Amino acid sequence: MADEKMNEGGVVEEAAGALERLLPEHPVLAGLFEQFTDVEWRRSSEQHTAVVPKDRLRDFSLAALQAGFEMLVDLTAVDYLRLRRVRFEVVVGLLSLQHNVRLRLRVPVPADDPNVPSLVPVYPAANFFERETFDMFGIVFGDHPDLTRILLPEDWVGHPLRKDFATGAVPVQFKSSPQVT
């Protein structure tokens, strides 16, 4: 938290010098950088990160695939409740085996519109990752072929990895389990 500061609204912001915001040195990343001028590029601890607007996610992902990022390694989300202006962030890990480089995509997602385009048409491996992120965070992936819960029962109320999810010692009765007496 040393590289972050609190503004008057109580929102943590990254300090200006915390991350490098330079043209990526790797030629594959530099090509994407030039193609997408609205994407913010960061590099910290040898990790290349692109902050992609959610309406450009599918276009950027398709360009990344064509540039050689053939593997989607991971897709998840982060809930920054009361820490940032934009509450959620979808985080996507891509890998280029042929160029030996990784790229992390961070997609800001506002709480009042938790919708992001699905990456399944570009990376079929995103299927179960998106279902898990929907199940745990409530982020909806538009055009997903089967956006249903994957870990919790269909009748579960809420999304347990949200910071405002109520926790407590209330016994949970699942519809398929025997009654607890």
Each model region followed by its residue ranges:
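Terminal low-complexity/charged segments
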Residues: 1-181
